[in-house]
């Protein structure tokens, strides 16, 4: 796959609507041509301990952040006509659909691919297929795991190798 948008969400709590950050990496002709990152005010607007432990974000980080529709208005032109790629499609696609429903936005039925599923087929010998393991195997060192843009970059790197 040579043209796509890799996307990653982090959530504030266990609600899929609680996206608190997003990273997007645009790949055209196999090259990264653009990136986007934003904090997002989550809905519902509370952080649970475990989610904050994973990504390091807290309510203070996002209290002045834009809400999802404002952020998506910036992302939409970047991804127009591109399939979306995520390392755990089940999570990221469900977040995207949930937050669209939450804000009563029409969901455009994006075409989604999963690098995690693809990596299980491409690299069955790996001890696991977590993002950092697969990206390292593909030659990308994921230094800031669970930062949405860093995770989207790692996903893009993997997708260029195996999709």
How would you label these PLM feature ranges?
Residues 1-109, 124-128, 132-146:
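Conserved non-catalytic scaffold segment of RNase H-like nuclease domains
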Residues 11-13, 117, 154:
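Short, glycine/acidic-enriched loop or turn micro-motifs at the edges of active sites
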Residues 92, 111, 151-154:
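Catalytic-loop motifs flanking and including active-site residues across diverse enzymes
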Residues 106-119:
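Conserved beta-strand -> loop -> alpha-helix junction used to position metal-binding or nucleic-acid-contacting
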Residues 117-120, 136, 157-160:
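Generic alpha-helical structural context detector
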Residues 147-160:
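Acidic, divalent-metal-coordinating active-site segment for phosphoryl/phosphodiester hydrolysis
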């Amino acid at each position: 796959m040579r043209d796509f948008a890799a996307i990653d969400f982090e959530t504030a709590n266990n609600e899929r609507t609680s996206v608190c950050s997003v990273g997007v990496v645009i790949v055209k002709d196999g090259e990264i041509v653009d990136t986007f990152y934003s904090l997002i005010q989550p809905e519902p607007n509370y952080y649970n301990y475990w989610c904050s432990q994973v990504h390091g974000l807290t309510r203070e980080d996002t209290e002045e952040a834009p809400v999802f529709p404002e952020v998506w208005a910036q992302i939409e032109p970047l991804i127009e006509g591109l399939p979306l790629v995520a390392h755990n499609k089940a999570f990221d696609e469900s977040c995207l659909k949930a937050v669209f429903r939450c804000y009563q936005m029409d969901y455009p039925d994006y075409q989604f691919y999963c690098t995690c599923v693809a990596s299980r087929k491409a690299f069955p010998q790996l001890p696991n297929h977590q993002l950092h393991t697969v990206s390292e195997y593909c030659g990308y060192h994921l230094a800031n795991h669970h930062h949405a843009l860093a995770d989207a970059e790692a996903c893009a790197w993997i997708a260029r190798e195996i999709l």
